[in-house]
Amino acid sequence: MSALAVALARQSESHADCPLFNDPYAQVFIDAALSRGCQLPSDETSERINGIANYASSRTKWFDEYFIAAGAHGLEQMVIVAAGLDARAWRLPWVAGTTLFEIDHPGVLKFKNEALHEHGESPSVSRYVPVPADLSDGWSERLRDAGFDVSEPTAWAVEGLLPYVADGPHLLFDRIHEISPAGSRLAVEAVGTGVADWLSTQGWQVTMIGAQELMTRYGRCGDHSDTDAGMDTVFVNATRTR
């Protein structure tokens, strides 16, 4: 599902009676896309968005809480892999001194930052660093070139990406593991237990929660049937211990 489609889902959640989060920037991206000649999703795609609304909102809330908790535990370096059009750098209450790196395709980051700049918005995080990169080649080198400190414990997030990683998820996590010292954290939306099992063997302490249990926690249920968000989806929260 496209980044714009997910932005539509976040925009809808922000206007719910009891929203799990408020994302005023989702509408900014929608308006910017329309002004650039983009088309809104088809009726079929809109039905799919509605079909996974509770799942998508619960996922966003879980990752939001993950970053807030990481900051509360003293981590000051954050990385979002394939950030898409979520505006966490603008909408979350970051601890002073935090640096947030966002890795994504150049076109996505260019559109995102231009749209927010045109709207007069500034990041809420102390230091925001977009890192244009192809996730299939050389992204970790570009991250270091952008100022990433390999000696500093880091909070990583991998959300909505694994179905699209052509060379397999373990190569992605190999690279994350290589540049993450003890004390680093990693949040992953995964399919099955393979990612959690691999991280456990590499010295990460892992907890998991299934999608249905997560939606129940947030008072959402019943729509987790779309093929993009299957019943075997789990949310992995890992801390590197060695």
UniProtKB/Swiss-Prot annotation:
Root EC class: transferase
Record flagged with keyword Methyltransferase: yes
EC number of this enzyme: 2.1.1.-
A family per Pfam: LCM
Matches recorded under InterPro entries: Ppm1/Ppm2/Tcmp (IPR007213), SAM-dependent_MTases_sf (IPR029063), SAM_mthyl_Trfase_ML2640-like (IPR011610)
Keyword Transferase: yes
Function, in words: Exhibits S-adenosyl-L-methionine-dependent methyltransferase activity.
Assigned protein family: Belongs to the UPF0677 family.
Identification of the protein by name: Putative S-adenosyl-L-methionine-dependent methyltransferase Mmcs_0580
